[in-house]
């Protein structure tokens, strides 16, 4: 079909069959499960605890006091203990987007555009979730990992100090001296040059990659000092290149999966709130796909984490 004149080819917001990106492609193949793609891509979801989530959220009980016992002699009065508990309430928040295509694009589906867009949207949701969980980026959640006040540099290895010393000695000391644990590690891909030359006390590579892994996995998994570790491309924020700590302090949940709604009857604003540009889908033979998901996340104790940075002595970056 000949291209229309209402919307230019290669429109910034609407996919059409005449777009340059669709030229020369064969018939598409069946796409895969899209929410599994989101779970697979999110690295925080790999280590955090997943909890059931209702539409109004969840109230999570949490013990904050220890139950005690004492040795006693015959006939002695037995001690009394109570312990203490509190609760955390986590609520789901919605994330959404809409993508628009011409009806002709929907029918022809060049280069499996629709299937690819669904996967890309799922990935975008996962990236937004990780950014909120790690750094509080555009986050509706009140807590996130980066609220920790603990930090150690894995790039500042002057003198006899090694990456092993910084992570397994200095970083771990910050945790255990505060009564915390080290269960997992998240690192950005930009730390790979640092890790490649790093050894443990026995001269073995500090980062030991998993023997078996998916060839198409969006992240690399392995271990650092026996702790499960993930390297991915979206951990870095400023000078922070990773986190180590107790990931059992993180919980997340979802309501259902990704929700897809398709319509050709609505009116969309292709502009902004301040400068609207309303377009009738029906009048212009367009189709809109609305994608929504509801996630909840809570970091119970940010001080159970150490931010790993690339800051070197003198204020620079490694």
From Swiss-Prot:
Entry keywords, A to Z:
Capsid protein, Virion
* Chief place of localization: virion
Q: Which Gene3D superfamilies match?
A: hypothetical protein PF0899 domain (3.30.2320.10), Major capsid protein gp5 (3.30.2400.10)
| Segments forming a coiled coil | none
Gene Ontology terms: cellular component: viral capsid
Q: Does the keyword Transmembrane apply?
A: no
Matching Pfam families, A to Z?
Phage_capsid
Q: Where in the cell is it found?
A: Virion
**InterPro entries associated with the record:** Phage_capsid (IPR024455), Phage_capsid-like_C (IPR054612)
| Keyword check for Thylakoid | no
The family classification in the record reads: Belongs to the L5likevirus major capsid protein gp17 family.
Identification of the protein by name: Probable major capsid protein gp17
Gene name linked to the record? 17
């Amino acid at each position: 079909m000949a291209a229309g004149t209402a919307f230019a080819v290669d429109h910034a917001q609407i996919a059409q069959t005449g777009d340059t990106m669709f030229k020369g492609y064969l018939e598409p193949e069946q796409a895969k499960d899209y929410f599994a793609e989101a779970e697979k891509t999110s690295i925080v979801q790999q280590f955090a605890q997943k909890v059931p989530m209702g539409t109004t959220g969840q109230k999570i009980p949490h013990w904050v006091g220890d139950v005690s016992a004492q040795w006693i002699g015959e006939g002695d009065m037995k001690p009394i203990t109570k312990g203490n508990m509190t609760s955390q309430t986590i609520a789901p928040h919605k994330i959404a987007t809409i993508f628009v295509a011409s009806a002709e694009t929907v029918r022809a589906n060049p280069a499996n555009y629709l299937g690819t867009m669904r996967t890309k949207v799922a990935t975008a949701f996962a990236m937004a979730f990780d950014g909120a969980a790690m750094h509080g980026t555009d986050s509706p959640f009140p807590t996130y990992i980066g609220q920790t006040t603990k930090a150690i540099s894995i790039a500042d290895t002057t003198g006899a100090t090694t990456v092993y010393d910084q992570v397994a000695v200095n970083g771990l000391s910050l945790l255990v001296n505060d009564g915390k644990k080290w269960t997992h590690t998240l690192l950005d891909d930009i730390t790979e040059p640092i890790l490649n030359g790093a050894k443990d006390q026995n001269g073995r590579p500090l980062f030991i990659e998993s023997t078996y892994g998916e060839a198409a996995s969006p992240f690399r998994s392995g271990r650092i000092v026996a702790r499960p570790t993930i390297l991915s491309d979206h951990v870095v924020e400023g000078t922070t290149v990773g986190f180590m700590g107790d990931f059992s302090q993180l919980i997340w949940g979802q309501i259902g999966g990704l929700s897809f709604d398709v319509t050709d009857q609505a009116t969309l604003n292709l502009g902004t709130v301040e400068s609207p540009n309303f377009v009738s889908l029906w009048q212009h033979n367009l189709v809109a796909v609305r994608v929504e998901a509801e996630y909840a996340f809570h970091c119970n104790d940010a001080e159970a984490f150490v931010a790993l940075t690339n800051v070197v002595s003198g204020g620079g970056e490694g």
